[in-house]
Amino acid sequence: FMSEIPDKSVSLMVTSPPYNIDISYGNKWKNRRIVSSKGKKYADKQSEADYRKMLGKVIKETKRVLKDDGQIWFNIKNRYENCVIQPPFWIMEYFKDMYLKNIVIWNFDWGGATQKRFCSRYEYVFFFTKNKDKYTFNLDDVKIPALNYRPDRYKSQLKNPTDVWKISLVSGNSPERTEHPSQYPEELVERIIKVGTHEGDLVLDPFMGSGTTAVVAKRLNRRYVGYEIE
């Protein structure tokens, strides 16, 4: 796994690993619902020990191929076990030799309904750098419209994003929708690649899924490499 990628050749890794909540990866999205597809499916319900061991191996290999000024963006969400929320902060164990710069809250506006707790409308995106100070951060490339802009008070109609990103999920009728049952939006990946890389840099996604990372990287003139679960 990743053995063909040279050491210290990747500028940025962005990924969203399997949730380990019994989603049938390999199924298809059809008519706004998940339907069974032919072929082998990844069993997204490993033991917790096996799941963490798998992620640990992937993260270890990512660090090997990451440049000294490289960065990792890791999307993961809370899980619920026995009616108790399980935050994903255990992943910090795998990044003790890196620098946590942000925990971005990805906020979206729709999802599943619940009756005995508030509906969840966010996931985490952990932003780690390999070097404490030396890393790419193209802030000007990801500025957003300032809704309260006043020419008498502000020089620009743009402002810096915060660590809360309001980006909608990919809906069933979205032009970017694929058959993958758990697809993250191009807008999310685009902001990450823009802020963390330059044209020609190599972007890695070890859990390629629907191919969103590759689509965005190509559009932004970045090189890319990705893997998918068999």
Where do the language-model regions lie?
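Core catalytic lobe of class I
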Residues: 1-230
